């Protein structure tokens, strides 16, 4: 086994990168090539960047459900129809991304590396609230890029083994962290998703009830917001659903999501 010995002695991966390998940071690599990303964005006008929306999270009995649509838009065009927006960051936490797709995905993956690195160094996982704080720091560090349009506004959720409940947080563009006690949605269709959840959510909802609420909220958002992708039966594209409980993270298969969708459609037609 090779042990790394350097100047940095903490447990943060990004801080270690800054101290030991600053040349590997993307902004420093661009600077070495003589590229100023902010100046390039200003000089070139608005960047054409894929954006991903809408995502949501809601508490249920014994945990939390996290969901996201699959559409990414680039202005008035479709950038991707099957973008993954919900990522596991460790065995008991999830991030749902909204904003500029590239920076969002990079931050989700970097957070996973951060948490893995912390657990290897400290010998135990970071507490759930500490994970939420770490994400807030990363979003705050992204503020200069956000001022150029590369906004990252995720939802973070997971199971807290100390409190034995599911918890979830929303964030603002400056890294402000706000815990929600029931449900939350972010992205272009978040207003409509929240309105849907306001009508359907109830304390103590079962896992299956919460999954139905999540799919229904995304369907309502897609019905009103052009940036939110609905169910694409022809292509077999359905929202991403994950459940986090004391047993870990369960990714819901698309066949189950399809059944939930059919049940909602039949119910609205008056047949269910």
Description of each model-found segment:
Residues 1-272:
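Long, low-complexity N-terminal extensions
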